Amino acid sequence: MAITIDIDTARPYQVYVGTILLEQAGPLVRATAGGTKAVIVTDTNVGPLYQMPVKQSLEASGYEVSICTFEAGEAHKRAETYVAILEFVAEHELSRSDVIVALGGGVVGDVAGFVAATYMRGCKFVQIPTSLLAMVDSSVGGKTAIDLAAGKNLAGAFWQPSVVIADVGCLATLTPEQFADGCGEVVKHAVIADPELFTELEKTPLTLELLNQDVARVALIIARNIDIKRAVVVADERESNQRKLLNFGHSAGHAVEACEHFELGHGNCVSIGMGIITRAAALHGICDAELPGRIEELCARHGLKTSCELSADAVFAEALHDKKRAGDTIDLVIPHGIGRCSIDRTPLSTFHDLIAEGLGQKGDASAC
């Protein structure tokens, strides 16, 4: 039995979290998106594992189904991939009432969603996330994007799906490293909005072992994370204010991701970003003194990094491409305690120093 979460955005939809949901994709898509044709967009890792049950379910529900596959990895979240999928969709003569189905992790969802947002100025879109990170974060909220040479997620659109189908059984095929990477967003949600969840994770970390022992409990944790994001997104769908809280750890984290040439997972980079900002906040007396240690320990128990060997100058240089930059300032999420964060417009020179302090390096605003 699936857990259902209502997302009451301008175009409302539901998220289903449970097991054996891939086989129910057809009826769920039919009931929410309609149309007669469906293109499944997937990658070379996920497609061989899960495309057939989804395709068969869609066909059983009356869809004419085509599959578009691209190379897996953040390196392929590029304009070339985006255009290739657009051409595929056009060649298969999808109309605006037909549906694009994203089957995969965050990269697949981001690219397929951007295609759906822009093909014929918008067609139906369904998210079927198969990674933990995509289930708890990127599949919900309507953000779609591709990367540019200058930085991550610099071209994109807000485009809400018709439905999100999160089959927790898909997580069993993740490596421990992939599963741990998704926990970066889980820890982030707990820090910004849910002290009780943070304490529960301290007692019992979210791991593949827990998935094998108690899949229902993992489904509940995933649903809880989705509900945290739901509350923020519904209050601020277009990220004009409070939705920026979801960017905790992301300004520095995205910069680390770029410095590492996207070879380090997004969740790990976010946890490094959280560590950087929290340690710097503690040095300035902005947050509870014990906060850095608690976050670092929880991240470590989930197999996540909270620091790196990069120079502050290198991280700062990449952070200058961040979408949250406004002239000589940037909007940073500053933690004060578990469940207590604020959005602060911070001078870039101060941001450079915070990065340096968070990395244990001497602040030097001359790089600004």
Each model region followed by its residue ranges:
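C-terminal charged capping/lid subdomain of soluble metabolic enzymes
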Residues: G184-V187, I286-C368
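Solvent-exposed alpha-helices and their adjacent loops that cap or buttress functional pockets
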Residues: T32, E93-S95, T118-M120, D147-L148, ...
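ATP/NTP phosphate-donor binding region
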Residues: M1-V99
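A glycine/threonine-rich phosphate-anchoring loop and its flanking beta-alpha core
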Residues: F114-T207
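Short glycine/serine/threonine-rich phosphate/pyrophosphate-binding segments
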Residues: V107-F114, M135-V136, A255
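Generic secondary-structure signature for well-ordered alpha-helical cores
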Residues: E91, Q160-V163, G169-P176, G184-E196, ...
